[in-house]
C-alpha cells in the first residue's frame, strides 16, 4: 500500500477517496503491507494538508488493523533502492517509492494499491477498479 493510497483512504476530500474505500473492500481478505517509509511519508502529507487529527487517524488505523501491517525497510533494501535510483533518469522517482520497489522485489510482491503511476512504470501491477 503506497502513500497515495493511504492519503486517498484517510482523506474524505481526496479525489480518489471513494475508489480507495472500494478497493480496500475488494481486497479485504488479501494480506496488505506497507512500509515504515510509506507510513512516515503518508503521516507528513496528511498532517500538512489535512491536519493533525486525520494524521493520527492514519497511525491508529495502521496500529489497529487486522489486515494491514507495517514492514521495515532494511538497510539492504535501502541500498538496492539507492542503486536503482542512480540508474534511473526516465522519471522523477521518489526515494520512498524506490524503497517500496526494493521491498516489493525482495518480498516477491507484484501488486500494489496506489494512485501513483510510477509503480506501473517500475513494472508493478497497480490494482484498480
Identify the residue ranges that each predicted region occupies.
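Short, well-structured N-terminal submotif of metal-dependent ribonuclease cores
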Residues: 1-34, 47-60
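A general alpha-helix detector
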Residues: 5-6, 41-42, 80
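Short secondary-structure boundary segments
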Residues: 36-37, 97, 116-117
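Short glycine/serine- and small hydrophobic-enriched flexible loop segments
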Residues: 44-47, 105
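Short, hinge-like loop/turn segments at secondary-structure boundaries
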Residues: 50-53, 89, 128-129
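Active-site neighborhoods of divalent-metal-dependent phosphate/nucleic-acid chemistry enzymes
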Residues: 69-111
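Acidic, PIN/NYN-like endoribonuclease modules and their adjacent C-terminal/linker elements
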Residues: 101, 106-129
